[in-house]
Regions:
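Charged, flexible boundary elements
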Residues: 1-22, 29
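Covalent nucleotidyltransferase
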Residues: 17-150
Length: 151
């Protein structure tokens, strides 16, 4: 079961004045990947590493990514990774990624194709009471890249 839901992007218009005051101290910007939103965490019910959509639907056909992240979650069982299932080579074929990750009963061929094509790009974590700057540092420290993890 998914523990928390991710923060979604909002239109700046209504918050423009408030945000402008906040911007005086700096601003963080991340590129937007047009992939499939994915939250990865150690499940609270059965302790397996699982992946979910932003609405809580479990993604089943990305075992290669979950297996790779097992050691991370052994060390940090309460962290939730927030990112996109994406492949830059498929940026014009978004439907291909969706069709691969939405499979609820993947065949061996589906699993192999997912292994070949679907990557997880991590750009944040969900960690209570930790500001973005510290979360971004955490992602960089553990995955070696500012804003993104490529598996």
């Amino acid at each position: 079961m998914m523990r928390k839901k991710p923060m979604l992007a909002h239109n700046v218009g209504a918050f423009e004045r408030i945000l402008y005051e906040d911007w005086q101290n700096g601003l963080y910007i991340q590129p937007k990947l047009d992939g499939v939103r994915c939250l990865i965490q150690k499940d609270v019910d059965d302790y397996f590493v699982k992946a979910y959509s932003r609405t809580g639907k479990e993604w089943k056909n990305i075992d290669h990514i979950l297996k790779e992240l097992n050691p991370f979650f052994e060390k940090y069982p309460n962290v939730i990774l927030d990112g996109e299932l994406y492949n830059h080579n498929l940026k014009k074929d978004f439907e291909k990624i969706i069709s691969l990750v939405r499979k609820t009963k993947p065949t061996d061929d589906d699993r192999f194709e997912s292994y070949e094509k679907v990557q997880f790009h991590c750009y944040d974590t969900i960690m209570e009471h930790m500001p973005f700057k510290e979360r971004n540092h955490f992602v960089k420290k553990h995955f070696g890249w500012d804003n993104f993890l490529l598996l």
